Amino acid sequence: MKWTEVNVKTTNEAVEAVSSIFDGLDAVGVKIENALDFENYRASNPAELMELKDIPHITEGAIVSAYYPDDTTNIDVILSQLRTKVNALVDFGLDIGEASITTVEVQDDNWATAWKKYYHPVRITRYLTVKPSWSDYQASFSDEKVISLDPGMAFGTGTHPTTRLCLQALEMTMRGGETLYDVGTGSGVLSIAAKHLGASDVEAFDVDDIAVAAAQENFDLNPIAKDIKVSANDLLKGINRPVDTIVANILSDILVPLIPQAKQLLNSNGYFILSGIIDDKLELVIDTLIANDFKIEEVLHYGEWRGVIATNRKDD
């Protein structure tokens, strides 16, 4: 079978947003080539004998590729919508780089499985490791928690800097027994991690029905996540039950309207963990948190990305 491969040359910062755009444009599959992924893998596995030159890869930026059957009749419309949506990411403060769009004909569907050989288990934090669903990797020490994900979904693999910041913050703040909301769950990795770290009750939300389905598939891959409830919802609108922790890894401009909602739903001294914040949006997020009477406990850094740990001040 022949396919049309559509490629967007962009930045590490924009890969997840571009992937989501492709998903909304009915791509059959999405592939991400990210120069930073190779550096992260090498840094996470310093003892492994691995020559990056043996694996075809780009050395800077990222390429997000999507696949459409060659008989797709509206490919020109898709390309036009893609260009508009990618350019609009600038309005959310994302650096999209050159954002060039190219197409190429692919002769068969080997792309659908060939990428699997480049995915390996990755140690994300002190205790949390993410592995692809087909890997038979087992925990190598007693406290290691292994999360199984299907990287074929266009909602991240747990290794993006914003996800790492959230996972680190969860590990820093959770003590066991917490109730938690995961807002903008995507792959569901944060919800699964929360269960591994001792959360007693987790609910996950995403505005995208496809993300909800992807998260449910990943929950099904992890026995510890079998009781996580996931549903489509616009942030926390209509949610009434207070919880101990709220975690959100979404764009800064979406975090801002979430903050007053989180204020109403967090128990006294509960933790609010935010990520997806580029450096020049950090002040806006922190100012909004303070205006809503949150206490800033810590700001985490990973490259150009920032994460914030805040607590809901106890009423005097």
From Swiss-Prot:
Its EC number is 2.1.1.-. It is an enzyme of class 2 (transferase). One of its GO terms (biological process) is methylation. GO terms for molecular function: protein-lysine N-methyltransferase activity. Keywords: Cytoplasm, Methyltransferase, S-adenosyl-L-methionine, Transferase. One of its GO terms (cellular component) is cytoplasm. The keyword Cytoplasm applies. It catalyses: L-lysyl-[protein] + 3 S-adenosyl-L-methionine = N(6),N(6),N(6)-trimethyl-L-lysyl-[protein] + 3 S-adenosyl-L-homocysteine + 3 H(+). It is found in: Cytoplasm. S-adenosyl-L-methionine binds at residues 163, 184, 206, 249. Coiled coil: none annotated. Belongs to the methyltransferase superfamily. PrmA family. NCBIfam families: prmA. Methylates ribosomal protein L11. This is Ribosomal protein L11 methyltransferase. It comes from Pediococcus pentosaceus (strain ATCC 25745 / CCUG 21536 / LMG 10740 / 183-1w). The lineage of its organism: Bacteria, Bacillati, Bacillota, Bacilli, Lactobacillales.
